[in-house]
């Protein structure tokens, strides 16, 4: 829909009237504190209770919207577990529709990943015991209900999951949750004039909104001490990719990707964050200057006025998070560590190659998801080369495995992408070296899928069987 001269004049007049500016636009200039999700930790074998239920949340100041969430809040608590633990989760579905949940990036056997075989009907529970045997990493949990994932994640069924180990404990980096170590969950929404999220599934592709949220609020700030600050970034949007940078041009120091630490920090001016992707960064706040993380150019006045008449995919504000330093510089501050891992990341030799094609239409390699069909069979403990192509740029994710990016459109990956991963942005072609460390079975397969959630719901999912070691 084009914006006519008459509509422009009408909207301009409306915008001058007090109280007539939509909340999503008027709130963009106001900053509120960053909500930090509560921390839920596994202790002495005690189970972690995760209740999926309706809740209320204020996306804009002065409003309350009906949402979904975990344990009574939009989104859910941050879960922290330790390598070597056996963690018992008790999911309880208190919604009026079926839900299945998964922890994306978790390295566990297929029966523990969730999915159709672990569907919870209303008032039902699921209580897996998860063996945590992987290295420290930032993961995330979310709904993965067939044909309903996009809507349910958009409604609020998601949260951050942290794995810690001896390496993460011993490194001289910030590790005090909510003090110098913060979860930053980025989403885009479309809010009506009352601050309530609107969701209309697009006819093709994935949903994109015009309002940027971090931990459920617009343009938040957080007060931090002078020194290093650690931000755990998660893109929990349905399909939007972000290009992040600091407002004053200072570098982002990337220390970790989807599956754990990089061998050494990588300093960048701009950082890509694809749907489902996680990255950890360090920001140097020792100079005492306020700084913001941003993600591109915001909507112009014409774009904002057009938003009165039609849904927009252009962000009203591109402000992600403002860091406000407080206090004095500590007498002793840690420098950026030269190394994060004691050894380089090793790679094996692939025993076979596969081609994966993500088309404009739903489906992978021309086939829609079929719960009764296994698309790929692999062997636990082996490596394969997967070449993934996409007709339209989108993120790609594989459950239950780790991979390394070998090349992107024939070129070497960026240094920040050279660690272990489970999610990758595909704009053309990427070559992956995939390691199958966990087994799965025909009734409990792993997924590989488009991380554009609407595309996955329409059938862009394949099923992976990993035969266990004899």
UniProtKB/Swiss-Prot annotation:
Protein's GO biological process: FtsZ-dependent cytokinesis
The lineage's top-level taxon is Bacteria
PTM annotation: Predicted to be exported by the Tat system. The position of the signal peptide cleavage has not been experimentally proven.
Location in the cell reads: Periplasm
The UniProt record lists the Plastocyanin-like domain at 229-287
Q: Where is the signal peptide?
A: 1-27
- Keyword Ion transport appears in the UniProt entry: no
Would you tell me the Gene Ontology cellular component terms? cell division site; outer membrane-bounded periplasmic space
GO MF annotation, one: copper ion binding
* Keywords in alphabetical order: Cell cycle, Cell division, Periplasm, Signal
**Xref: PANTHER family:** BILIRUBIN OXIDASE, CUPREDOXIN SUPERFAMILY PROTEIN
What biological function has been recorded for the protein in this entry? Answer: Cell division protein that is required for growth during stress conditions. May be involved in protecting or stabilizing the divisomal assembly under conditions of stress.
Q: Which HAMAP family match?
A: FtsP (MF_00915)
What protein family does this chain belong to? Belongs to the FtsP family.
Protein name per UniProt: Cell division protein FtsP
Name of the coding gene: ftsP
